[in-house]
C-alpha cells in the first residue's frame, strides 16, 4: 500500500503541475491578447476565442479575471512573442512559440533543451516555410456548401473546408482568423466551436524511429517544462 500511495501522490503532483502550467499559459496569453486588442471580448474576437478555449480546458474564472485585470491596468509585465525554429531528432522540424519578458533568458533555455536532445536550433525561417500558419475553426454541422458560401460572401480567403463525421472544419490563413469567425457568427449565429485556434500545420511529415523517438520525447518534455513556452509544433511521425 505504501508504494501505491506514493505512486498516487506522485500522480497527483504531476496532475497539479500540469494544471498549473495550463493556467499559467492561458493567463499569459489572455493578458497579452487583452493588452494589445482590448479587454472587452465583444470587441476583441481573438480574446473571446481564447477565453472560450480556456473555459473548455477548465481554467478557473479567477485566473481569467486576474489576467484581464492586469491587462486593463497601467504598466504590468511586458511580454513579447518569441518564436524559435530548429531540427529535432531524425531531422524532424520543430517550432517553439514563447511569451517572454526576457528574450535572452528564454533563448538560452530553449537552446539548452535542443542541445540536451541532440537537436539543433536554427535561424528564423529555417523550418517555418514548411508549415502553414492557419486559423482553424471546427463545429458541428454537415452543410459544407452553406459554410463555404457564407465565407465567400464575407470575402474570407478560405484555404480548405473539411466535412467529416458531422463536423465542419474551416482552415484559413492566420491573418483571417477574426474575419472568418465573424463571418460564421453572422451567418449561423453563436456556434459552439470544438476547435478555435491558430496553429502551424506541417506540410509534410518526417518519420522518427529507433533511439530518436526517446530523444524526441525528451525534447518535448524539457521544452514543456519551461514556463515561457506556449506552443510546440512539429512534423515528427513517430515510428514503432
Curated annotation (Swiss-Prot):
GO molecular function, one term: DNA binding
Coiled-coil stretches noted in the UniProt entry, renumbered to this chain: none
Principal subcellular localisation of the protein: cytoplasm
Pfam families cross-referenced by the UniProt entry: TACO1_YebC_N, Transcrip_reg
GO annotation, biological process: regulation of DNA-templated transcription
Localization of this protein: Cytoplasm
Keyword Cytoplasm tagged: yes
Swiss-Prot/TrEMBL keywords: Cytoplasm, DNA-binding, Transcription, Transcription regulation
InterPro entries with a match to the protein in the record: Integrase-like_N (IPR017856), TACO1_YebC-like_2nd/3rd_dom (IPR048300), TACO1_YebC_N (IPR049083), Transcrip_reg_TACO1-like (IPR002876), Transcrip_reg_TACO1-like_dom3 (IPR026564), YebC-like (IPR029072)
One Gene Ontology cellular component annotation held by this UniProt entry: cytosol
PANTHER family: TRANSLATIONAL ACTIVATOR OF CYTOCHROME C OXIDASE 1
Family statement: Belongs to the TACO1 family.
Record-given protein name: Probable transcriptional regulatory protein Csal_0810
Source organism: Chromohalobacter salexigens (strain ATCC BAA-138 / DSM 3043 / CIP 106854 / NCIMB 13768 / 1H11)
